[in-house]
């Protein structure tokens, strides 16, 4: 796996699923391929994205700044600086300085990532802030190692939280989660279907599913009534894809 592929993988792991994630993935691919060289416009676009947490925006801004060639005097962005200040905690800053000194002696991506993984996400973000504000200088490879370690820490905590929700025995939470998944699957189907004539059927199925979820929420239904909703939708989607000549088996 190439270095940039690895960076893209880690960064996208902390972005919530949805149309915005697909957009960010495309931007990252363009940046890494050298197709997008307007850092100013890229940062302005990132700043105004909804849903993303300030820290995620800060990490993406850091990655864009590392990758896109820019004029020396280009102004640093406040939204990135604020996100990478370790919540203003002096302990984070102390640890960030110690980590920076270690990273300065490191030259490889994996070496930097190994060192960084033993620090908290707050200290890692502060260390990124030091580098972003030009208070410290490390090689691009080492900076990417720091980025990936930070994303791994964040993704770990997101995964723990997600696992707790999936494993919950509370029927109301499970019911709502199934309806949310069915609704987002329906949205994805509508987007994939596009405007072709054969898409009418898939669009109809997706639309009915969303109306059904709305009705279930409006009248309040038994928690078990949502079982299998998403799977039924995915089966419909796969049937539609086969007719279109697309073979994708990995949605479930």
Swiss-Prot record:
Membrane-related topology note: Peripheral membrane protein
Residue numbers covered by motif Nuclear localization signal: 101-105
Residue numbers spanned by region Membrane-binding: 1-164
One Gene Ontology term, aspect cellular component: host cell nucleus
Superkingdom as given in the UniProt entry: Viruses
Compartments reported by the entry: Virion membrane; Host nucleus
Keywords, comma-separated and alphabetical: Host nucleus, Membrane, RNA-binding, Viral matrix protein, Virion
Spans annotated as RNP-binding: 165-252
GO function terms (MF aspect): RNA binding; structural constituent of virion
GO biological process: viral budding from plasma membrane
Keyword RNA-binding appears in the UniProt entry: yes
InterPro entries noted in UniProt: Flu_matrix_M1 (IPR036039), Flu_matrix_M1_C (IPR013188), Flu_matrix_M1_N (IPR001561), Flu_matrix_M1_N_sub1 (IPR015423), Flu_matrix_M1_N_sub2 (IPR015799), INFV_M1 (IPR037533)
Role of this protein: Plays critical roles in virus replication, from virus entry and uncoating to assembly and budding of the virus particle. M1 binding to ribonucleocapsids (RNPs) in nucleus seems to inhibit viral transcription. Interaction of viral NEP with M1-RNP is thought to promote nuclear export of the complex, which is targeted to the virion assembly site at the apical plasma membrane in polarized epithelial cells. Interactions with NA and HA may bring M1, a non-raft-associated protein, into lipid rafts. Forms a continuous shell on the inner side of the lipid bilayer in virion, where it binds the RNP. Determines the virion's shape: spherical or filamentous. Clinical isolates of influenza are characterized by the presence of significant proportion of filamentous virions, whereas after multiple passage on eggs or cell culture, virions have only spherical morphology. Filamentous virions are thought to be important to infect neighboring cells, and spherical virions more suited to spread through aerosol between hosts organisms.
Protein family membership: Belongs to the influenza viruses Matrix protein M1 family.
Subunit structure and binding partners: Homodimer and homomultimer. Interacts with NEP. Binds ribonucleocapsid by both interacting with genomic RNA and NP protein. May interact with HA and NA. Cannot bind NP without genomic RNA.
Note: Most abundant protein in virion. When expressed alone can form virus-like particles in transfected cells.
Designated name of the protein: Matrix protein 1
Gene name of the encoded protein: M
């Amino acid at each position: 796996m190439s270095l940039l592929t690895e960076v893209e993988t880690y960064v996208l792991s902390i972005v919530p699923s949805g149309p915005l994630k697909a957009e960010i993935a495309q931007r990252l691919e363009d940046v890494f391929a050298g197709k997008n060289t307007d850092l100013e416009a890229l940062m302005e676009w990132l700043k105004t994205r909804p849903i993303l947490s300030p820290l995620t925006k800060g990490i993406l801004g850091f990655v864009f700044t590392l990758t896109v060639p820019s004029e020396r005097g280009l102004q640093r962005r406040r939204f990135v600086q604020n996100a990478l200040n370790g919540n203003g905690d002096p302990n984070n800053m102390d640890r960030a300085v110690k980590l920076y000194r270690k990273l300065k002696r490191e030259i490889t991506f994996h070496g930097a990532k190994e060192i960084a993984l033993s620090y908290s996400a707050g200290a890692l973000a502060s260390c990124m802030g030091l580098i972003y504000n030009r208070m410290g200088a490390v090689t691009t490879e080492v900076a990417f190692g720091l980025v990936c370690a930070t994303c791994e820490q964040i993704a770990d905590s997101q995964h723990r939280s997600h696992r707790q929700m999936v494993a919950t025995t509370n029927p109301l939470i499970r019911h709502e989660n199934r309806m949310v998944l069915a609704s987002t699957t329906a949205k994805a189907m509508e987007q994939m279907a596009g405007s072709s004539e054969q898409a009418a059927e898939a669009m109809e199925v997706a639309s009915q599913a969303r109306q059904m979820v709305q009705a279930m929420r409006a009248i309040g239904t038994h928690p078990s009534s949502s079982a299998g909703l998403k799977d039924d939708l995915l089966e419909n989607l796969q049937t539609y894809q086969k007719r279109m000549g697309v073979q994708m088996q990995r949605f479930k």
